[in-house]
Amino acid sequence: MQDLELAWSKTVSLGSLGDIAGAIAKSLLEYAAATSGPFCLWLQGGLGAGKTTFTGSLLRALGLGDSIPVTSPTYTYMNEYHIPSGLAAGWYAHLDLYRAAAGLDVGELGVFDARPFRGLIVEWPEMLADPESLAPTHILRIDMAAGGSSRTYELKVRRF
């Protein structure tokens, strides 16, 4: 497999999160159209970096309705979201593995048993025994570093 390649790095205020999420949503949809496969977006950053907040913005940019709450699945490990229509129509999984035991097997989560997902958004992927098992076709990593009222977003892409 190829190493991750830096696509871009931006530091923005929290008010610009929608713009960042929109740009990444466009990239994910272009990938899905080109490959007919799901994407897997890894979110990395410390506690409070804004991973779940970003996930909500990304799902909204993909077309999730404002009335549907996007919450952290810290205790349930996975939340599912359905976008009923549009270019991004389909099911999406948001995983938060922070409380998982180190070395968790992806099969234990039942991610691939639940339904065919158009995309997977994964917080704390390093908790998996085989992190690559959640990325059969594509990985996007975003490293977010807290910096007061702004965040630094570094997008890395791996295509294989």
Go through each PLM region and give its residues.
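Conserved lysine of the Walker
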Residues: 51
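Short hydrophobic/aromatic beta-strand immediately N-terminal to the Walker A/P-loop
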Residues: 40-42
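Short phosphate-coordinating micro-motif centered on Lys-Gly-acidic
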Residues: 1-3, 102-160
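Phosphate-binding P-loop
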Residues: 27-38
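P-loop (Walker A) phosphate-binding loop of NTP-binding proteins
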Residues: 44-46
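Short beta-strand-centered segment that lines the nucleotide-binding/catalytic pocket of NTP-utilizing
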Residues: 64-81
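Charged, amphipathic alpha-helical linker segments immediately N-terminal to NTP-binding catalytic cores
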Residues: 1-19
